[in-house]
Amino acid sequence: MPELPEVETSRRGIEPHLVGATILHANVRNGRLRWPVSEEIYRLSDKPVLSVQRRAKYLLLELPDGWIIIHLGMSGSLRILPEELPAEKHDHVDLVMSNGKVLRYTDPRRFGAWLWTKELEGHNVLAHLGPEPLSDDFNGAYLQQKCAKKKTAIKPWLMDNKLVVGVGNIYASESLFAAGIHPDRLASSLSQVECELLARVIKAVLLRSIEQGGTTLKDFLQSDGKPGYFAQELQVYGRKGEPCRVCGTPIVAAKHAQRATFYCRQCQK
């Protein structure tokens, strides 16, 4: 599933082509996504794009009279293409722009979303989200406060959007490795020093992935059709049985809350 770096990469890629241009119309080929494509999107016509923002894993397209909320789901990606390029099997939504470009949404598994809202504040998909991990609100003191009485393993807790948004399976595994923290550790067992370190490395790992265009394991593509190159730098995720890049110990795979977790038994305590 695209996580924060992939969504932010998409935002940065599409923003220059959308802001200042006008949506001439939308072409919805298959509206049966995780939730049905909002009726307002079908009727879009002559709507200038004022901004392209991100909250958690949601892309937010600001129009004069409302917002388009886009979620990439498990396998979605957004590309900027010439208007005349024919659509393929899994290309479900196009926004046809006044500059001759098309914003094309591709999603083989159709688990994403295209929603419309007049007001962002209070919308059900955005209402109960934690802080952005790259903001000043997310720091060691905040993390320690939220972990202090939490009797659950730190790995699934990091993936809870009420704690912090956008840190999915890949980046939780990678951040815990970078901090030297075992994913089975109870959140409440983390010291102040460990919380400070973990908050810092989460920011560093996410920023590095954004620099590399995110992580492509299967479906994700940047807006120009290129893969995300952070996959080449993964330290533990997807490397079961391979030697740890630090100590040589084979990487272990386990399940936490039905999600695969990867770690090094030697480097993470």
Curated annotation (Swiss-Prot):
One Pfam family of this chain: zf-FPG_IleRS
Origin: domain of life: Bacteria
SUPFAM superfamilies associated with the record: Glucocorticoid receptor-like (DNA-binding domain), N-terminal domain of MutM-like DNA repair proteins, S13-like H2TH domain
Swiss-Prot/TrEMBL cofactor(s): Zn(2+)
Reaction(s) this enzyme catalyzes, per UniProt: Hydrolysis of DNA containing ring-opened 7-methylguanine residues, releasing 2,6-diamino-4-hydroxy-5-(N-methyl)formamidopyrimidine; 2'-deoxyribonucleotide-(2'-deoxyribose 5'-phosphate)-2'-deoxyribonucleotide-DNA = a 3'-end 2'-deoxyribonucleotide-(2,3-dehydro-2,3-deoxyribose 5'-phosphate)-DNA + a 5'-end 5'-phospho-2'-deoxyribonucleoside-DNA + H(+)
A Gene Ontology molecular function term of the record: zinc ion binding
Binding site for DNA: H90, R109, K150
UniProt key word Cell inner membrane: no
Cofactor annotation remark: Binds 1 zinc ion per subunit.
Active site residues per record: P2 (schiff-base intermediate with dna), E3 (proton donor), K57 (proton donor), R259 (proton donor)
Subunit: Monomer.
Record-stated family: Belongs to the FPG family.
Function description: Involved in base excision repair of DNA damaged by oxidation or by mutagenic agents. Acts as a DNA glycosylase that recognizes and removes damaged bases. Has a preference for oxidized purines, such as 7,8-dihydro-8-oxoguanine (8-oxoG). Has AP (apurinic/apyrimidinic) lyase activity and introduces nicks in the DNA strand. Cleaves the DNA backbone by beta-delta elimination to generate a single-strand break at the site of the removed base with both 3'- and 5'-phosphates.
Name of the protein: Formamidopyrimidine-DNA glycosylase
Species this chain originates from: Citrobacter koseri (strain ATCC BAA-895 / CDC 4225-83 / SGSC4696)
Gene name of the record: mutM
